[in-house]
Amino acid sequence: AGAAEMWVKYLGGKAQEELKGTAVNGDPGVAEAVRQDKFGIGYNNVGFAYDPATGKPIEGLAIVPLDTNGDGTISADENFYGTRDEFTAAVAAGKYPFPPARVLYLVTKGEPNATIADFYRWVLTDGQQYVQPAGYVALTQDRIDEALAALPGSK
């Protein structure tokens, strides 16, 4: 499920089709539609809400915080939206709810062949350098070790 599907589940719905509003194509479309409409609101993946160069919200977008404890205010421990790094650290620490946050997986039909297993190894090792700059939460070393051990050809 994508960002819109997770958002509708957070709001208590079941399917993306329940969302009403202007249809747009993909994450860049959501960001641009909101930027162009002073009353626009959208839900988007982190990599399209924060500027990759500065880590700050993209010009023309405001990141609206969630009152996760339901007390009617954004308390200090809920105010982690200033930069992409602050936000992803809060997600990693479990301060941002699931959904709308979600775990992403790599899957194959059946056991991965040697080429795919090598790709998974790269993702779990050298590829990890690209995770945080792209706006994702890095895996813990324990999760990486567990996944590597499960790959075919691992000792």
How would you name each of these model-derived features?
Residues 1-155:
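Exported/periplasmic ABC-transporter solute-binding proteins
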